[in-house]
A protein has these predicted regions:
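Conserved SAM-binding loop
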Residues: 94
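Conserved SAM-binding motif I beta-strand of class I
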Residues: 81-84
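Signature of N6-adenine DNA methyltransferases within the class I
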Residues: 46, 53, 91, 99, ...
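Class I S-adenosyl-L-methionine
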Residues: 1-71, 76, 86, 90, ...
């Protein structure tokens, strides 16, 4: 999005047309939705919300620089953000953390844009942080979307090898991978990729997960990626790197 802003600002368009394009970008951003189906205490959602708020601020700053200052309106809102978390305490923390992030960004807004004000109280509605099992709940019910809407799914699903799954987790894998041969050899995280692929199929939505490299090498490649690539295509990927996190698994 920052690249898109720079592209507009650096273009040969007249300032009023640049302003029009920037406002159109704000309107597009306001319709986006963001879902973390393994959100834990909300780290990824918090970062996404804060960065989107900063994009919004930058656009208003650019409008002012162009001599096309606009009355401040709220485009990025908490109700665009959704999460699923199986741990009750963590889901409560995620909800609270989003409200804290909202307050922090309201303070930052007041410092950057002197003419803008955005009250924290009363607390704003969050799209939904669901205390539920992401492999047992319909993601479409959590974060409803149409084919044209832009929904961005991201997160850090749990890492468990196929041999470490308990009885309940094995049953979840069986229910999700019906018709997929040798699913019992797949890591637990494969279920999030498969459900995510089904969610974004034939839509403008995107999905990106931090994942174990085991699903991208050895026997799991053919087992997992074949059914997924029948639904969607890969637009980008990163090579393996060391990842530190405080997740339980």
């Amino acid at each position: 999005l920052n690249d898109k802003i720079s592209e507009i600002v650096d273009s040969e368009l007249k300032n009023n047309n640049k302003a029009k394009k920037l406002i159109e970008l704000l309107e597009r951003i306001s319709k986006m939705k963001f879902l973390d189906p393994a959100c834990g205490s909300g780290n990824f959602l918090i970062i996404a919300y804060k960065e989107l708020r900063r994009v919004e601020m930058r656009i208003y700053e650019e409008l002012e620089n162009l001599g096309e200052a606009q009355l401040y309106l709220e485009y990025v809102k908490l109700d665009q953000f959704y999460g699923i978390e199986i741990d009750n305490f963590a889901s409560d923390v995620a909800m609270l953390s989003m409200w804290i992030a909202d307050h922090q960004m309201n303070v930052e807004l007041a410092e950057k844009l002197k003419s803008a004000a955005r009250p924290t109280i009363p607390l704003k509605k969050i799209g939904g942080i669901y205390n539920a099992n992401a492999l047992r709940i319909n993601w479409q019910e959590v974060c409803p979307r149409t084919e044209d809407e832009e929904v961005f799914i991201f997160g850090n699903p749990p890492y468990l090898g196929a041999r470490l799954l308990n009885k309940e987790q094995n049953q979840e894998m069986e229910d999700i991978f019906k018709g997929v041969t040798q699913y019992k050899r797949l890591d637990y995280i494969g279920a999030w990729f498969y459900l995510g692929a089904k969610y974004i199929e034939h839509t403008n939505s995107k999905l990106s997960f931090v994942s174990t490299n085991s699903i991208c090498q050895g026997e799991q490649v053919a087992l997992m990626w074949k059914p997924i690539l029948e639904l969607v295509e890969i637009s980008f990927a990163y090579t393996s790197f060391k990842w530190q996190n405080s997740a339980k698994a």
